[in-house]
């Protein structure tokens, strides 16, 4: 990591980011490098080529020990993940949302948590993670986004990616379609803790997969309903009626679902 940090510093403070998050029934892994354009390099360095090398290296050539992810590094990451999952109970707002999602999505792939589950962490091995990594390289759909570069630079980055893919026996799976949980009778679940402020999370479904032409209207509806300090929830439920400490809504197009989060008095 020290060598990588020095490398990024020499590239005028370039930034490497690796991020994973669920998107409906899919899991999205993003590897990106951000830095200044070649034209601003003081000594004419080919920065774009270096950025591509770092991003592709992180994606296709991770640090292995004996053919698997470094057991020591895996052990450290397991400890950190386990601690984060154990501490989640202390963030009742996040805990409430995760519990609601678990109830709402049930066994659907859309309900799989980004961080996984505490009971599964201890059993993870470097071999399992390595096998999952290679399966991802073989079956994942891959998109390349290049911003702020010339056509020639973009073509060079594309060729470098294709060269990496050529060495893999690829069999990409079809992209998962948007889903929606079926409509059903309301389900209520309550957990009791010794705390000053209670948390309320409500999830709603469209009942059918969201269509592309609906997206703009839904975004506007969310802003009006609970997505800003001028929304109906904020102005009426919080400011006028004083029924909560906070109240907001969000919408996920991949799953056709809306969430309303609020902090309330226990009596309410």
Predicted features, each with a name:
Residues 154, 230-234:
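Internal amphipathic alpha-helical segments of the cytochrome P450 catalytic fold
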Residues 222-225, 234, 238, 261:
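Generic hydrophobic alpha-helical scaffold/packing signal
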Residues 211-214, 232-233, 246-247, 268:
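Extended hydrophobic-aromatic, low-complexity segments
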Residues 1, 141, 170-231:
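His/Glu-based metal-binding/catalytic segments typifying zinc-dependent metallopeptidases
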Residues 3-172, 239-268:
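Charge-rich, well-structured scaffold segments of protease-associated domains
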């Amino acid at each position: 990591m020290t060598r990588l940090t020095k490398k990024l510093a020499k590239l005028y403070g370039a930034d490497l980011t690796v991020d994973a998050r669920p998107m409906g029934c899919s899991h999205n892994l993003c590897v990106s490098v951000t830095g200044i354009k070649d034209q601003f390099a003081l000594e004419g360095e080919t920065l774009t080529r270096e950025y591509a090398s770092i991003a592709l290296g992180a994606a296709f050539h991770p640090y292995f020990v004996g053919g698997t992810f470094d057991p020591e590094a895996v052990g450290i990451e397991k400890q950190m993940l386990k601690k984060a999952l154990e501490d989640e109970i202390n963030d009742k707002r996040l805990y409430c949302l995760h519990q609601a999602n678990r109830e709402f999505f049930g066994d659907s792939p859309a309900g799989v948590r980004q961080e996984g589950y505490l009971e599964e962490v201890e059993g993870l091995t470097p071999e399992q993670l390595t096998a999952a990594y290679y399966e991802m390289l073989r079956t994942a759909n891959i998109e390349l986004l290049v911003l702020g570069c010339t056509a020639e630079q973009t073509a060079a980055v594309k060729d470098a990616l294709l060269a990496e893919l050529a060495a893999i026996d690829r069999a990409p799976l079809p992209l998962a379609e948007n889903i929606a949980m079926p409509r059903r009778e309301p389900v209520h679940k309550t957990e009791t803790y010794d705390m000053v402020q209670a948390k309320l999370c409500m999830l709603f479904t469209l009942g059918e997969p969201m269509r592309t032409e609906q997206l703009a209207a839904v975004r506007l509806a969310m802003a009006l309903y609970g997505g800003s300090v001028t929304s109906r929830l904020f102005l009426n439920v919080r400011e006028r009626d004083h029924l909560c400490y906070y109240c907001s809504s969000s919408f996920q197009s991949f799953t056709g679902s809306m969430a309303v989060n609020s902090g309330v008095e226990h009596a309410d």
